[in-house]
Swiss-Prot record:
It is an enzyme of class 2 (transferase). This is UTP--glucose-1-phosphate uridylyltransferase. InterPro entries: GalU_uridylyltTrfase_bac/arc (IPR005771), NTP_transferase_dom (IPR005835), Nucleotide-diphossugar_trans (IPR029044). Belongs to the UDPGP type 2 family.
Amino acid sequence: MIKPLKKAVLPVAGLGTRFLPATKCVPKEMLTVVDRPLIQYAIDEAREAGIEEFCLVSSRGKDSLIDYFDISYELEDTLKARKKTSALKALEATRVIPGTMLSVPPAGTAGPWHAIWCAREFIGNDPFAILLPDDVVQSKKSCIGQLVEVYNKTGGNVLAVTEVPREQTGSYGILDVGKDDGKTVEVKGLVEKPDPKDAPSTLSVIGRYVLTADVLKHLAKLEKGAGGEVQLTDAMAKTIGHVPFHGYRYEGKRFDCGSKIASWKPRSPLRWSVRNWLPACVNS
């Protein structure tokens, strides 16, 4: 029997050094694309997929990530008194049901994937999603929701994947693929940031994952891998042959907001959001 997927882990402990000095006092995940911070794009995507519980693996100085999703009674009372109904409505998306979001500290600095192991008490024996807020995916249907649909049919692990030029394979986790129906691929192996000439394919993994709890026991045993960090790719590879494992070519466009140059790219394609908002702003 395939367990329903209701949990998500978001690794958000990074220092955001690529965005200094902006991230000296503001968490990178609170930087905005149009009218929402990166963290809200990720949470909205997960909630659209039916995910109900969230664990932020965070670090000191990032309390604002939890505060953002808390209720601000003083602010809401002020907006109500001033009859700012549109502003009140905008705040609705920032609320989570009390008791459904928690923050845990990372143990050490072994990289973002070590953070998943730090969420093991939250995960328990349940399947869980991982969303990296650096990746914003514009799609008609939630990207992680597309993976959940595949998971509900196949069980096991499901990764969001996309084709990249061979010369860029050295920057990503790359799949060694088996059966391929054009959308869903069987995963035979995983390689983290291979030399392009040795890459088994050009299918790369993006920051959206659906995993079973089996991966945790492998994360606990791993030594540091590529980049001197514990690599989730290595732990996932050890589950191949023990649980179903698939990659899914998601529908949508992914924007990498983890670097200064790349973070500007979503602003143009997401201008539809501004077009809907600007007339109301000008006329208010």
